[in-house]
Structure formats: C-alpha cells, structure tokens
C-alpha cells in the first residue's frame, strides 16, 4: 500500500490489514516516507484508533529492524510500562527488576528516558552508576551472570530515528508510544506490561499473543497507574497458553494494606533512587508497591505458580536484602564492561 492510500484510508476511519500496515510502517522506519506523510499517517491512525492487527504489524517491523540481544529465554521477563500515566512515581518497574533477579527470575529490561514520570529507567540507571550504552553481547552477559540486563531503546531501535522529527513536532501520542513494550530486543517471552489506558488492556494482550509471547500480564490501575497500584484495584488481562483472561486484583488480596501514593511521588531521578533503595530492602510503602509488581513478574516468568506465591517470593527477596546487592553488582559489572570497551 502506498503512503497516500494509507493516509486516506485511516482518515476515513478504515482499518488496515496486517500486510498494508507492515508495508507502511516499513516505509516509515526505513526512511522512505516524508515527514509530512509520517505525521499525516500517525495522526490519522491515532484518531481512528489502532487495532490489535495494526499494532502487531507495526511491532513486527520494529522487531525485524532492531539490534537483538541473544540470550537464553527460560524464566526471562520484561517489566515495562507504556508511560503516559502522569503519576510521577519513583521507578517501580526498575526496582521490581532487581527483586525478581534476586528471587530467581531473569530480567531483560527494555527502557528509555522518561516519558511521563520524573524518572524513566534510563534516568534512574544513570544516577545509580549503571552504564546504559553496552553492546548486545555484554547486555546478554549482564542477564546471564547477574540476572538483570538493561537494553537502552535508542541503541537497539535505530530505525525509530526516521520518525523522531514528526513525533516531536506533533507532540501527541501515537502508535509509537505503545510499540516499545512490544519490541523487547532479547525477545523476552514473558512480561508484566503496564498501560496508561484501560482500552489497551486486551488490545496489547492480543498483539502480544499474535507476536508469540507466552505469559503476559497487561495491567492498568483504576487510579490511572500503568502498573499494579497500592492505592486502588488494578485490572489485568492475562495471556497464558494462548488464551486471554481478564480479572481485577487489589492490594488486600495479597495481605497488603491500601496506601496513598503521595509518599511515592518524586521530582528527580535522585529522589527515585532513594525510594528504590528503600523498596529493595523492604522498607515503607515503596516496598509494598514493588512487592506487588515484582510478584506479578515472578508469576509471569514462571518462577511462581500463582500471583499470591509471587508476591510472597518478592517479599522474601526484599527481606534478604539481596535485591540491593544485585543493583550494586550490576553497577560494578557494567562499569567494568564500559571501561573495557573504551580501551
């Protein structure tokens, strides 16, 4: 399908087939489309509303063009959010990654700088002294030897550069805002994925089913968080064994008291790091929200058989203080690798 035809179709609110979307997105990500065409298509698609088929095709193109990380995928999980919830909480997903690693999971963390919060994964890793710009083979070593590896999105998705200008100038959400969680460079088959809009729950679960994921929990809290909330019930769309089931969970289901989110809000990455460190050793409300999310990730990864068991494993992990040691270990390891690459 030609760009002009695709723009006309989405402007008339016509859904595109997988093949047509794939062709258009490939033109965008290989530099064949003009900025005006990119902007027109993305706006038209957003106003129409993206289907699971269109999202799947767009993600497939990104996967075909990305720089992959080759690693064993057993018990491999990504903990990621779309961003866009505007809550400005500390980085719950990154803290959860270290808890999961200390409990026996393996985390391929795919992230970028902040979208909606004061501290994205990359921002936090910067202040924690964890090197971001490692080549794929060394990211794989981090995952294999420590249990956590961080894949800085711009290093693995260079094809995205063709859409940066139009996206920045438009300043609105487009399909690109939800593609990151669907394009893990290590091919993590399991995920805890937070979304900013409840309408995306089943759409994202269906897209991941089509892309071959094994066990995924897509979550959106009733208070708007793109993760499992400590302050409100959270809706879940769970993909497992090729089937999608929806249900709702709440903190009290796991013996955790509901608490306000205000103490978890941060302004800087340094603020976020303080709360992350508290969460990693089981201190305060930060520990509780991390236990919920890390527990869900342990369940998705197959380390725990149930969500409840996952939360207990996460709490035991925090009590051991090992997650904080994992973070220090990753900082030391990536520093050594980064210095080696500079020689």
Swiss-Prot record:
Protein encoded by which gene: trpD
Lineage: Bacteria, Pseudomonadati, Pseudomonadota, Gammaproteobacteria, Oceanospirillales
GO biological process: L-tryptophan biosynthetic process
Binding site for anthranilate 2: 167
Residue pairs linked by disulfide bridges in the UniProt entry: none
Pathway the protein takes part in: Amino-acid biosynthesis; L-tryptophan biosynthesis; L-tryptophan from chorismate: step 2/5
Top-rank lineage group of the source organism: Bacteria
Protein's recorded name: Anthranilate phosphoribosyltransferase
Positions contributing to Mg(2+) 2 binding: 226-227
Species of the source: Chromohalobacter salexigens (strain ATCC BAA-138 / DSM 3043 / CIP 106854 / NCIMB 13768 / 1H11)
Catalytic class of the enzyme: transferase
Binding site for anthranilate 1: 81, 112
